[in-house]
Regions:
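Short, hydrophobic-biased segments on the C-terminal half of alpha helices
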Residues: 56, 74-75
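N-terminal leader segment of winged-helix/HTH proteins
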Residues: 1-33, 80
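Alpha-helical linker/hinge and terminal dimerization helices associated
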Residues: 18, 22, 29, 63, ...
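A cross-family signal for key residues in well-ordered alpha-helices
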Residues: 16, 44, 134
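Charged, amphipathic alpha-helical coiled-coil/dimerization segments
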Residues: 75-135
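N-terminal positioning helix adjacent to the helix-turn-helix/winged-helix DNA-binding module
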Residues: 11, 38-41, 55, 102, ...
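N-terminal helix-turn-helix DNA-binding core of bacterial DNA-binding proteins
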Residues: 20, 24-66
């Protein structure tokens, strides 16, 4: 098709296509734990940040998503017994998040899977070219 020349030169199409492929890849990778990518990132964050306080608003800012999206993920993780909400002692309207024991085990599996995926990317294209590509994509995406 004639449009293919345009598509082959379009960074927007390339990034969108890559995003769809990465979504499919992470869905497959996280299927055993029935997690989506954002839920996996939340578990990994809670694991790495512990014992520091993690608030949903911080997660929303960090992952550049809405508080509603984070709230939905937290509710899902909480329903599966992976995380718990704790009322903020300084502000009863707010709460902190913590991993439950099963959530900690799941977080370790998620971290291992994401780490392996990162190593696979680095092996496929090389560490330096991957970092260069990330810088380019971030510059196209604009200021964070």
């Amino acid at each position: 098709m004639r449009i293919e020349t345009f598509l082959n030169q379009s960074p927007m199409f390339c990034i969108t296509l890559a995003a769809r492929r990465f979504d499919a890849l992470t869905s497959q990778l996280l299927a055993a734990d029935d997690l989506n990518f954002l839920e996996a990132l939340i578990l990994a964050t809670l694991f790495f940040e512990s014992p520091a306080i993690v608030k949903p608003s911080h997660l929303a800012d960090t992952f550049a998503t809405t508080r509603g999206n984070i709230s939905h993920c937290i509710s899902s993780l909480e329903a599966r017994g992976l995380v718990q909400r704790k009322i903020d002692p300084d502000d009863a309207r707010a709460y902190h998040l913590a991993l439950k024991p099963h959530g900690r085990k799941t977080a370790l599996r998620v971290i291992a899977a994401l780490d392996k995926l990162q190593r696979d990317f680095e092996t496929k294209v090389g560490k330096a070219p991957l970092q260069s590509a990330l810088r380019t994509i971030r510059s196209l995406a604009g200021p964070s």
